């Protein structure tokens, strides 16, 4: 990952955790 991907990866990861948390 690099550039925007580097910033989006943790965001998507957090969203994934929230979805699985539900």
UniProtKB/Swiss-Prot annotation:
Keywords: Amphibian defense peptide, Secreted
Annotated localization: Secreted
Chief subcellular location: secreted
One GO term of the biological process aspect: defense response
Tissue specificity of this protein: Expressed by the skin dorsal glands.
Top-level taxon of the source organism: Eukaryota
One GO CC annotation: extracellular region
Biological role stated in the UniProt entry: Lacks antimicrobial activity. Does not inhibit the formation of NO by neuronal nitric oxide.
Family, as annotated: Belongs to the frog skin active peptide (FSAP) family. Rothein subfamily.
Name the record gives this protein: Rothein 2.1
Provenance organism: Litoria rothii (Roth's tree frog)
Source species taxonomy: Eukaryota, Metazoa, Chordata, Craniata, Vertebrata
